[in-house]
């Protein structure tokens, strides 16, 4: 089911991006999200994703009733192929699954998840090795990127349910093996992963896939 979503993200052309505002100090160190206000706009909001500035990725994250709803619906509910950043509908919304998948369009104007393409270069990862997920419980989780790959939309990296520890270990090994470079970041059976997925310029079946491991959780704004 999630693989059909990644296929659906393939046929995207240049559109204007949309972003709802969180608030932050200039360096991003005291970024905060008003989820009550966001829910008044869209009750499907479950998180906010942010990369270190000057990154463009700084968006609300929703979860629809299925994995097609937000392919062409903006956060404010308008029909537009820019869509919205969204969590796999079959994950739990609290980011406590072993692997939670977040999808976003590759917009040719540089918005949404276009910027993930820059992680194809290890030098970019060295500058910006982490991203942040803010949740309605008032916390922010830091994820350290351990793998960046260009994969097919049927890749094992899209697995989000695991029968046992061995299946999860196989997933971790597969994601490390598919990485374009060695990050040296360690993962194990107690890890919790967030996978970011977007399209590429290479072809309709290819995806840029970025895997991050949760390394810290703390109250947002501290």
What is each model feature region?
Residues 59-76, 161, 213-215:
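Short Gly/aromatic-enriched secondary-structure transition segments
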Residues 44-45, 54-60, 66-69, 109:
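Primarily extracytoplasmic ectodomains and periplasmic/lumenal surface modules that are beta-strand-rich
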Residues 11-44:
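N-terminal low-complexity, Pro/Thr/Ser-rich intrinsically disordered segments
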Residues 130, 177-222:
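Extracellular/periplasmic metallocenter environments
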Residues 2-13:
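Single conserved hydrophobic/aromatic residue that forms the stacking wall/gate
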Residues 102-106, 117, 144-147, 152-195:
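Surface-exposed beta-strand/loop segments enriched in Pro/Gly
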Residues 76-158:
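Mid-length scaffold segments of soluble, non-membrane domains
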Residues 43-46, 54-56, 80-82, 95-99, ...:
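Extracytoplasmic
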């Amino acid at each position: 089911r999630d693989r059909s979503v990644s296929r659906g993200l393939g046929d995207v052309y240049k559109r204007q991006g949309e972003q709802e505002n969180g608030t932050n100090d200039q360096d991003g160190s005291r970024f905060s999200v008003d989820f009550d206000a966001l829910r008044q706009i869209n009750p499907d909001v479950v998180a906010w994703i942010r990369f270190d500035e000057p990154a463009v990725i700084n968006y609300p994250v929703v979860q629809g009733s299925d994995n097609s709803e937000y392919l062409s619906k903006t956060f404010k509910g308008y029909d537009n192929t820019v869509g919205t950043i969204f969590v796999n509908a079959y994950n739990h919304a609290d980011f406590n699954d072993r692997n939670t998948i977040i999808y976003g369009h590759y917009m040719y104007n540089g918005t949404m998840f276009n910027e993930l393409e820059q992680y194809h270069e290890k030098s970019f990862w060295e500058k910006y090795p982490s991203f942040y997920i803010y949740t309605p419980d008032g916390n922010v989780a830091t994820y350290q990127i351990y793998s960046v790959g260009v994969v097919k939309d049927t890749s094992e990296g899209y697995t989000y349910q695991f029968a046992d520890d061995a299946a999860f270990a196989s997933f971790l090994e597969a994601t490390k093996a598919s990485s374009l470079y060695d990050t040296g970041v360690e993962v194990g059976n107690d890890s919790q992963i967030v996978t970011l997925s977007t399209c590429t310029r290479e072809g309709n079946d290819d995806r840029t896939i970025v895997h991050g491991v949760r390394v810290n959780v703390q109250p947002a704004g501290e």
